[in-house]
Amino acid sequence: MSAKQPNRKPTGKRKESDASALDGRERKRAAKRKGLKAGSRQQAEQSSKNNNGKQAKDPRIGSRKPVALIVDEKGAKPVAPKPAKEKKLVMTPEQELAAIENDDRLNDLLDRLDAGETLEATEQAWVDQRVDRYQELMDELGIIDNDDDEEDDGSFDDASYEAPTQPASEEELWDRFTQVDYQPEPKPEPKKK
C-alpha cells in the first residue's frame, strides 16, 4: 500500500491570473476615488467650445491703454478730485411743513397718544423730534396756530368770557402735556344773564 500523504491546508492567498489581478486593482482604485478626474475646468470648457480650430481672444488678458515705461515728470498731472455732489433733497420750509402735516405715521402716532396709549421709546422720541421741528418751522414762517384757541362756530361770546387770572406759560402747558396724567385746563363757562 502506498503511504497516504497528509492533507495540506492552503497557505497564503490564492493565485490569480494577471488579467484578473489587474481588473481587481482597477476596481479598488475606482472605489477609492469619489470625484472627477484631476484637471483644469477651463481646459475642459475650451476644448468643448473651440472645436473649429479658431481660438477666441480672452478680453481679460492685456490692456488697451498704453503704459509709460519711463517716468516723466512733465507727463504726470495731478488729478483734481471731483467735487462731491449733494444728493440731499433740499425742501423749502413751506414744503417741509406741509410734509410734516401730511405725514401718515406721525398722524397715527398722535392719534394713539390722544387715545391715551403709551408709545415705545423710539416712537415717542421720533414724535417729539417731528413736533419740535414743526414748532421751529411755524416760528420761522411766522405762522401762529390759533385753531385750538378759538371755536369757529360763533357760539362763543367775547363779552361774557372771563380770562383766567394767570395764563399758563408755554413751559407749564408743555410739562402738563408730556405728563401721563395730563388733565386739560378747565374752560370757564360763560356767565348767564
UniProtKB/Swiss-Prot annotation:
> Where is there biased composition of kind Basic and acidic residues?
13-26, 184-193
Q: Which GO terms describe its biological process?
A: ribosome biogenesis
Return the Polar residues bias intervals.
Answer: 40-54
Biased composition (Basic residues) is annotated at 1-12, 27-36
Q: Where is this region: Disordered?
A: 1-91, 143-193
Q: Kindly indicate whether the keyword Metal-binding belongs to this entry.
A: no
> Locations of Acidic residues compositional bias?
145-160
Keywords, sorted A to Z: GTPase activation, Ribosome biogenesis
The Gene Ontology terms for molecular function here are: GTPase activator activity
Which family does the similarity line name?
Belongs to the YihI family.
- What is the role of the protein in this entry? A GTPase-activating protein (GAP) that modifies Der/EngA GTPase function. May play a role in ribosome biogenesis.
How it assembles, according to the record, is:
Interacts with Der.
List the protein's name: Der GTPase-activating protein YihI
Protein encoded by which gene: yihI
